[in-house]
Design a protein with these regions (language model features):
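Regulatory and interdomain segments flanking nucleotide-handling catalytic cores
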Residues: 1-207
Length: 207
């Protein structure tokens, strides 16, 4: 983040990269469902995790993560508002979040990047940040331009590959790290399977 933004109100946009290939990397129904669920929830869960683990109990009410709550829709922009972070929208692997200053945003960005990698093993999050103005329309236009610029120059990080003596997953090519359903899987596959509801798998397979 640019240093001049650290003390200013900012709008951040988060974009999960590689969603399609992540979800449909395998034909296993359980992994496809699990991957879809992980992608749908990853940003909001990451922000909730930050508030829970990095924000003091006294300040948690100043971090608004529930963007569906109409009662707090304009909480950040009200006069004399003390809200430090407010999620404005989440969907389709994207999220728009307002921060009272860039320093808070920077801390969240570092946490979220690590969280996404730990929970999905191979997805990346692109982050664009601009100074907030009084024009939401103009801010939306600028943040999307900035995101396109960021993504055009952002290398896609991948986990360390397998050594020649390490067994690998036949689908992903990643190192085998555990067993599920009596089969060997890499970390990415295990995380997908761990997030799925068995009842949903049964419903799909019955159709």
């Amino acid at each position: 983040m640019r240093e001049e933004l650290l003390g200013k109100e900012v709008l951040a946009m988060y974009d999960i990269r590689g969603i399609q290939s992540y979800i449909f990397k395998t034909n296993a129904v359980k992994e496809i469902i699990g991957a879809s669920k992980l992608v749908d929830d990853i940003i909001i869960n990451g922000l909730k995790s930050y508030v829970k683990n990095r924000v003091s109990t006294e300040e948690r009410d100043l971090y608004l993560v529930d963007w569906h709550n109409e009662a707090t829709a304009d909480a950040f922009i009200k006069n004399d508002s003390k809200v430090l972070m407010q999620v404005m929208f989440v969907g389709g692997g994207n999220a728009y979040v307002l921060f009272r200053n860039g320093s808070i945003c920077s801390a969240v960005n570092k946490y979220l990047g690590k969280y996404v990698l730990e929970k999905t093993y191979s997805l990346n999050v692109a982050i664009a940040v601009i100074e907030k103005t009084d024009s939401y329309k103009e801010d939306y236009r600028k943040i999307n331009i900035e995101m396109r610029r960021i993504k055009a120059h952002m290398p896609i990080s991948k986990p360390v590959g397998a050594f020649s003596f390490t067994a690998t997953d036949t689908v992903t090519g990643m190192p085998i790290t555990g067993v599920a359903d009596k089969e060997y899987h890499c970390t990415e596959s295990l995380l997908k399977r761990a997030s799925v509801d068995e009842k949903n798998v049964e419903k799909i397979q019955c159709h």
